[in-house]
Amino acid sequence: MTSEKAGGYISKITLNNGDSLPIQENDIVVFVGPNNAGKSQSLKDIYALSKEKSPSVVVKEITITKHSTPISKVLAGVASGENKGDHTSYDILGHNMNIWNFSDKLFAQNDFYEDYRDLFIANLDTSARLTICNPPSNITRDGRKTHPIHYAAFDSKYRKWLSVSFKKAFGIEITPNTQYGSQIPLCIGKPVQLTEEFEDEQSRLEKYASILDTYKQVHNQGDGIKSFTGILLYLMLDYFCTYLIDEPESFLHPPQARIMGQIIGQTLSDQQQAFISTHSEEIIKGLLEVCPKRIKIVRITRVEDTNMFSILDNNEFEEVWNDPLLRYSNIMASLFHKSVVLCESDSDCKMYSIIESHLKQKSKYILKHCLYTVVGNIVWEKLLLHFVL
């Protein structure tokens, strides 16, 4: 039996048009839509509203369902506290959190996470992902862990997971270099294996350090590698209940974006949820390949200052995804187009595309953001019932 996770989960979001979307504890909600429609703003709203009731733009309000596990227990398990007399102070990834003897009771009574938000909500915007890759200060093996790299540096469970996940996308491992000095950079390269004999272990350690010094370091690489690694560093910490991930495909080649979708879907437990904004068909395909039952799609459009929403829930998505013809077609690309033409055959797609191209050249006729896709005659009805956004 899985023990109850401390914190809670977002069980409902209410959009600015009054529509409500119920959310399960393990749902992965994906926001899609054109630029400036409100995808990223939705994540910002959720992050702000999870702390306290506040003005918002796209998401009007959220409902948080809390668990009964004391937050003092999870804080003590995540970080070493500093006794301040009448309370204990914790540093959680740069966020200071204090616990008094009455804190657990007040937390349970409040509708929001308040000052403990960043213990349960991981807000992964682009800036957070890039900067988290910077080497943290070195600590003793049993010192206070204030950075995700500290966990990978001193716990083999985290180190191995981080390296294996990185290798899936880039074909090479990463290693925290605890011998670097005052900092712990992540080094890119094959894990060091010393086979020669040394006169003592100190000599072996010095040789190990000298080899790692020749490796490239993650924080000095391009934004694609840093963004990918940044997401991994947060996913690695399993005490988070909810992840807000803004455009995880940023700076990534499409194959790596698909792998990122797979890793997110595989890593999040049944007591973790995510809200993701994306322009990437590959992110969605990666998620669907590993956890189709967990996916909800919210397509956001905007006319002037008015948002409109179309929602595709778990059951409808799974039914469409389980059809082999649709699964291996480009139907997922329809989520990112304004118009979709369903064709019986590939030759029909080509013919209509040629006609459209001709009309665009000869007149002012423009069919914006149109996708021609092959679905076959048999699955038309299913698509019209379940996949029209």
Language model segments and positions:
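Glycine- and acidic
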Residues: 29, 144-149, 245-248, 337-339
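Conserved helicase/translocase motor-coupling segment
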Residues: 338-389
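Short active-site oxyanion
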Residues: 150-152, 271-274, 339-340, 369-370
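Extended helical coiled-coil dimerization/tether regions that scaffold
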Residues: 2-6, 12, 123-242, 254
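Short, glycine/charge-rich beta-strand/loop segments that flank catalytic centers
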Residues: 61-64, 179-186, 281
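Hydrophobic, Leu/Ile/Phe/Ala-enriched alpha-helical segments that form helix-helix packing faces
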Residues: 46, 50, 162-174, 264, ...
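Switch/communication elements of ASCE P-loop NTPase nucleotide-binding domains
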Residues: 1-55, 198-333, 349-353
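Conserved P-loop NTP-binding catalytic core
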Residues: 45-140
